[in-house]
A protein has these predicted regions:
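Residue-level detector of Asp-centered blade-edge/turn motifs that repeat once per structural unit
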Residues: 39-40, 80-81, 126-127, 177-178, ...
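Cleft-lining beta-strand/loop regions that shape enzyme active-site pockets
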Residues: 511-521, 535, 540-730, 769-773, ...
């Protein structure tokens, strides 16, 4: 009040229908996150949008077993007798094991009561008395269903980075046919995966691999006489075309381990007079017998070619396995769920055949008769005897649930809070009272009217950790702006106000080393020159009355006719055809790199080379070789890590740059060569700035640690914690929980929230940059030129072939 000086709080209320918060019936067939199958293969289990459904092979209704929009129900597993379904649910506030009747008529029963933690991967024992599972502590357990007693089996002390949380150890376990043993793999102190067999009666686990290789995905044969497993022990090197280096792919084969010391081999010698081998593979209901002494020596290789095998399962006739025939399972390849092909190896014929292609996952029924598979957005069931099947997709048109958004938003918020609690690398959450933070931001949830509001609240919550790589995104967002593509010609323009016409001020070209990036106006025969006028697009006259880009709406990727002239009039103009880009980002990037390269080349009389790293993953892996090999004989190199978006460890690039000559070869008719052949004998500097982060932080750090030269620029972003994978939320959103952090060789925490401080600080002036001036690049050139003047790069040469005898 301007007269009294009093302040009064205004109560503002904006009426809204809150359409995103309304309960509604939705189909979730495009949100499937897990599958399973009934014991006789008549129905599939489908996990979608946090609900558990059973779907008939052909006839009958779809049952929604859980009907819990406010809970995330997951990892369903059908009991061997077909009467119950086990699954995990966070209905209580933590993920607990529940069981429910297979038609959902009765209320579910919660079997566990944990205080906290994330659990995954449920598997029933064949006799139906126990359920094995794994938690975030990398511990394998089994639950006695009757007594509800939980027994720990084993704990993994090591893990690989960058694997999904549901594939963290110990997840590849399998039961013996008599339910008395569990086989699984875990990483040992040797940093290789080994197979262990745990005896429930002895409460003891034994390493049965005792090998030097990666052994994993074990499965018992149905007669209980052998253990089949995958092992990465086939090393057929692929050599690089440019240098002496080896890469090993397709390293996996499948092996059998005979469990009894007097047992028959899995692949005995064939003899027409011998008993039909198939008779020896019938299911044996008696107890499995294992002679652990010498078991690691009773291993044989199955007659299959090396590949990328995973996820074994068996019935009486076949071994089933997935193989990723294109690409690989390399943990350094960030991809979505891979597409794999299902094969079967027949025990009798000792040959394999394809079953179905391009699936994400599969499961074999308890009786071995049927297979459920997940392929794209479809789920299907086919007989296990199928060969090269096109599949049998189930009818998911009625895979529907009652969605109550506000209840789901509460679940999403609570799960995001729990995931940080359970997977954040520092158990004390950097001193943040995490319970208090949950309560603080939960008060905002009732005010949320959209999924975007929920994302914002979670972002504020995880922001309290003051840690990089904490992201939340995606989800069931309804309000999405429609985008209209705008074609881009790869040029800068100016408006000739007098003529009211646009002219080309700068035309972006593609340098020889980047022909894979298209420059629309730089194709042979176009001959468009800077300063010429753009008069028409598809016969529509282009004038300054409209924004230039309005003429290119909807034309990205389309062939367009351009009328061009060196005068602002149609007389004498020529028509050319071009294909505009959707984005000029890549084209402008390579032009910036090429300008820098040429500038360094010109200012150093060709003695200094230039290499830019846009990231520490595929971008650099693609561009690095294009200008690395051609600059091997430079006397200086500028390693530009500015604006580096990160990815993985950049050492793969730096080790090449840091390879020095150890000796030399001389030849009669050509110049001498270095040993190794690909070496760098040059003075180097590394440029960096505040826009370089994650792997972009690591690049200047490792460059300096390796003693490769000084770092120039400004302090980096300071984000060097890691995330193994994005954590899925119930509605398709994603969350990250940083689960590892860097420290140096003295045990000091480094870089995170600090960045890498350069040896020589040089600010980047944006105005100068826009005018083509780059103080950091200039400083790098100056330093290397000065270094070359004081310490010239020389080749030693060799002594004469025949020494002068009088020289002594």
């Amino acid at each position: 009040d301007t007269r009294s000086g009093d302040n009064q709080k205004l109560n503002i209320h904006i009426g809204s229908d809150s359409p995103e918060a309304r309960p509604r019936l939705i189909n979730v067939k495009d949100q499937i996150t897990g599958i399973g199958i009934s014991p006789k293969g008549k129905r599939a289990l489908v996990e979608a949008r946090g609900e558990i459904f059973t779907v008939p092979y052909e006839h009958g209704p779809i049952y929604n077993l859980t009907k819990s929009s406010g809970a995330h129900d997951k990892d369903p597993a059908w009991s061997p007798n077909g009467k119950k379904v086990a699954y995990l649910s966070d209905e209580s506030g933590e993920y607990e094991i529940h069981i429910i009747d297979s038609k959902g008529k009765e209320k579910s029963v919660q079997l566990t009561d944990h205080e906290n933690g994330y659990r995954h991967t449920l598997r029933w024992s064949p006799d139906g008395s126990k359920i094995a599972f794994t938690d975030q502590n990398l511990t394998l357990y089994f639950l006695d269903v009757a007594s509800e007693k939980i027994t720990p089996v084993d704990k993994a002390e090591y893990e690989s980075v960058d694997v999904p949380i549901d594939e963290k150890p110990i997840y590849d376990f399998s039961w013996s046919p008599d339910s008395r043993y569990l086989a699984y793999s875990k990483m040992t102190e040797k940093q290789v995966f080994q197979i262990f067999i745990y005896s429930l009666e002895e409460d003891k686990a034994r390493n049965v691999s005792q090998s030097l290789f990666y052994d994993f995905h074990p499965v018992f044969t149905r007669d209980g006489r052998h253990l089949l497993f995958v092992s990465n022990r086939t090393f057929n090197p692929t050599f690089g075309d440019f240098e002496w280096e080896m890469v090993y792919k397709d390293v996996a084969k499948i092996y059998s381990m005979t469990l009894q010391k007097d047992g028959k081999p899995f692949m005995p010698f064939r003899n027409d007079e011998a008993t039909d081998n198939n008779e020896n593979r019938q299911t044996d209901e008696s107890q499995v017998k294992i002679d652990f002494e010498g078991i690691s020596g009773r291993v044989e290789e199955l007659p299959l070619p090396a590949g990328n095998y995973r996820y074994l399962s068996v019935n009486d006739q076949n071994l089933f396995y997935l193989n990723k025939e294109e690409g690989d399972f390399n943990r350094f390849e960030f991809r979505e769920v891979p597409s794999m092909n299902l094969h079967a190896f027949n025990f009798e014929s000792r040959s394999s055949h394809p079953v179905i292609s391009s699936i994400h996952e599969y499961e074999l029924s308890q009786d071995g008769s049927s297979i459920v598979y997940h392929q794209g957005e479809s789920v299907g069931i086919l007989p296990s005897s199928a060969r090269e099947s096109k599949g049998h997709s189930l009818d998911l048109s009625n895979l529907e649930m009652e969605l109550e958004p506000r209840k789901e938003w509460q679940q999403i918020y609570q799960e995001a809070w729990r995931m940080e609690r359970d997977y954040y690398y520092e158990p004390d959450m950097h001193g943040v009272d995490w319970d208090q933070m949950r309560e603080k931001y939960a008060k905002l949830l009732p005010k949320a009217t959209s999924r975007e509001d929920v994302r914002y609240i979670i972002g504020e919550l995880i922001g309290e950790l003051n840690t990089s790589h904490t992201y939340v995104f995606g989800g069931d967002r309804k309000r999405r702006a429609e985008s209209v593509n705008v074609g881009m010609l790869g040029a800068d323009y100016t408006l000739d106000e007098k003529a009211n016409r646009y002219r080309f001020e700068k035309i972006l070209r593609h340098p020889a080393w980047a022909r894979g990036v298209m420059a629309p106006l730089d194709r042979p025969g176009m001959n468009i020159r800077e300063g010429e006028y753009l008069l028409a697009v598809n016969d529509e006259s282009v004038t300054g009355e409209q924004n230039l880009y309005s003429y290119f709406q909807g034309l990205a990727g389309e062939q367009v006719r351009l009328l061009v002239n060196n005068e602002p009039t149609p007389e004498g103009a020529r028509e050319i055809t071009a294909e505009p880009l959707r984005s000029e980002r890549s084209l402008r990037y390579i032009n910036w790199v090429e300008r820098n390269r040429q500038k360094v080349e010109n200012l150093s009389d060709g003695k200094i080379g230039y290499i830019h790293f846009p990231d520490t993953y595929m971008g650099s892996a693609t561009f690095f070789p294009k200008y690395f090999y051609s600059q091997l004989r430079k006397e200086g190199l500028i390693i530009d890590g500015r604006f580096n978006g990160g990815g993985l460890d950049p050492y793969i690039f730096l080790q090449r740059l840091n390879t020095k000559p150890l000796a030399y070869w001389t030849r009669r008719y050509s110049h001498d060569q270095t040993i190794p052949s690909t070496t760098v004998n040059a003075h180097m500097v590394c440029l960096t700035n505040k826009y370089a982060g994650s792997g972009g932080d690591m690049l200047p750090f490792e460059f300096r640690e390796l003693g490769m030269g000084p770092v120039i620029g400004t302090r980096t972003w300071g984000g060097l914690v890691g995330v193994s994978q994005y954590i899925p939320l119930v509605d398709g959103g994603m969350l990250t929980a940083p689960d590892y952090r860097i420290y140096d060789q003295q045990g000091n925490w480094i870089i995170e929230n600090e960045g890498v401080t350069p040896d020589i600080r040089v600010e980047l002036n944006s105005l100068e940059m826009s005018n083509g001036k780059d103080a950091q690049l200039r400083k790098g050139i100056e330093m290397i030129r000065e270094k070359l003047q004081n310490e010239p790069i020389t080749w030693p040469g060799h002594k004469p072939f025949l020494e002068d005898p009088q020289a002594n």
